[in-house]
Each structure stands twice: as C-alpha cells, then as structure tokens.
C-alpha cells in the first residue's frame, strides 16, 4: 500500500484525505480526529443506529457560558404595585442555565400588573428574553424599564423582542429590569432566556442533520424546531455529524455523539 507523509499537522483537529485527479478533489477514506499523537477515525456504522436529542449547532465557549451565568442567583417576581412592596416570588435561578429556553410552570397562578428580573447583590441585571403567559396565551407588556442601562444601546424592551442576541444589562449590580402589562393579569407560567450566542436550537427554525458516510454528507432529514431540542432517529454509530440551520446564522461545526451528548472538535480532549 502506498503511503504519504504529512508533517506539522495541528493537533485537536478533524482531517480527511483528498486525492486530486482530472481537475477535481475526491475524499479518500474516512475523516479522523488527530489528538497530536494518534488518529481516531469516524466510521459510520449504518447497521447500528441510535436516537438522540440535539441542542446546539456550534460549541458553547467559556465566554458565552459566563454570559449565561450572569443570570445565576437572580430571581423573578410579580406585583400589583409599581414599587413591588408586596411582590410575589416566581422563581430563583439557582444555577447557570444549560439551555436557552427555560420554561417555568408556577405551583399556583400569580396576579400582578408588573413583573421583573432582579439580579443578585453581586450580579448585573442581564437578560435576553422573558415572556409571561396565562396558559398558552402570552401577556404582552405595554411598557418596560431597567435600572442603570450599561450602554446607550441597551433597552428594557429587548427582553421581549423575540431576538435572542439582544439583551438588557445594567451598569451596576443589584439591579432589575421591569415589564408593565398595563393592568393586573394572571400569570401561571413564563419563559426566560439568559444572554447567549443564538447557537442553541431555536424554536421555529428549520434544521437538517447530516452524517459523513460513503465519501459524502448524507441527510438524516429536515425538521422544524418545536422545542429547545431536535429529536433524531436512525443516526449511524461512530459517525461524524453536522447540524445545519437553513433559517438563519452562519456558525456551525461538525461534532460526534458521546454518552448521549454532542462533542464538538473544540470540546475534544487529548
């Protein structure tokens, strides 16, 4: 068997060999991960398939994880009075969220005209989205305001503009961002979203999952996201995967599944 020697390859990368003939490149063999010493090939076994749930199309960086942690130890509350003197606690965010959409169902309905997120004494009021509901009907605010916006381009209404990349952030800790419903309403559930990179599965977007096999990318089908994750069946064991959002965005990266979790190249350990 003929061999080729490649020098100075960067470690912790995925590679595939290509042959050039008749003016075109064609893949040879399977893609593989190089850890700096050994290679680990991705071989799709279509005789052994599994089902899973996908939550992201791009790795979650430490920077974004820290942004998401900005909401930790804060709490949501509602009140009939603007000063929140008799506020009712809706929930406390006890840990850094692991996903973008965080749905809270209240033990009992709460009445109030105003709702707000309050950061901890050490944290900044930093929220991408917060939406309040009675049943499945959203209660849309008529007004909003926040304590000490951090920049001239930071507005309280951005917490209900349905744009995950926009957010409110205060310039001081122990602050809050408030929405006004215009009248006393009944809230029995709500959704909050921490500041994030919008690379989580986004409800309403159309996605397509691919696996590498037989020298090309093979589609496992298109799906419209109805929840914060995409359920997929028939995924070949050992395959290299790629999730494409055909609705929006550019950041996407190959990954494989390990112990039921997505592992992107940047997540791989030597």
Predicted segments, located by residue:
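Short Pro-Gly-centered beta-turn/loop motif in secreted/extracellular proteins
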Residues: 2-14
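Short coil/turn segments at the loop-to-beta-strand junctions that recur within blades
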Residues: 225-228
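Noncatalytic modules at the cell exterior or secretory-pathway interfaces
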Residues: 11-14, 108-119, 233-247
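Residue-level detector of high-confidence beta-strand sites
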Residues: 92, 220-222
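Disordered, acidic Ser/Thr/Pro-rich linker "stalks" and the adjacent N-terminal cap
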Residues: 12-15, 19-101, 105-110, 123-189, ...
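Short beta-strand segments and strand-loop junctions that repeat across beta-rich extracellular domains
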Residues: 74-83, 205-216, 239-243
């Amino acid at each position: 068997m003929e061999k080729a020697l490649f020098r100075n390859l960067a470690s912790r990368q995925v590679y595939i060999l290509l042959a050039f003939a008749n003016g075109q490149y064609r893949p040879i063999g399977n893609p593989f991960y190089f850890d700096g010493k050994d290679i680990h090939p991705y071989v799709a076994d279509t005789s052994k398939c599994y089902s899973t749930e996908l939550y992201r199309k791009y790795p979650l960086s430490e920077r974004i994880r820290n942004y998401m942690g900005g909401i930790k130890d804060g709490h949501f509350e509602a009140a009939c009075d603007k000063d929140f003197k008799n506020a009712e606690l809706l929930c406390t965010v006890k840990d850094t969220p692991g996903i973008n959409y965080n749905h809270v169902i209240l033990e009992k309905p709460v009445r109030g005209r105003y709702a707000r997120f309050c950061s901890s004494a050490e944290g900044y009021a930093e929220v991408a989205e917060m939406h309040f509901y009675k049943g499945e009907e959203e209660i849309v605010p008529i007004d909003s305001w926040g304590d000490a916006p951090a920049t001239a381009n930071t507005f309280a209404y951005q917490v209900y503009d349905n744009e995950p990349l926009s957010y409110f952030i205060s310039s001081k800790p122990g602050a809050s961002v408030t929405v006004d419903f215009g009248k006393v309403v009944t809230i029995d559930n709500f959704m909050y979203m921490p500041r994030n990179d919008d690379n989580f599965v986004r409800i309403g977007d159309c996605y397509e999952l691919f696996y590498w096999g037989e020298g090309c990318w093979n589609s496992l089908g298109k799906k419209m996201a109805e929840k914060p994750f995409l359920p997929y069946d028939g995924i070949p064991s050992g395959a290299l995967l790629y999730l494409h959002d055909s609705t929006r965005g550019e950041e996407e990266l190959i990954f494989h599944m390990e112990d039921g979790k997505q592992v992107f190249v940047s997540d791989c350990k030597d």
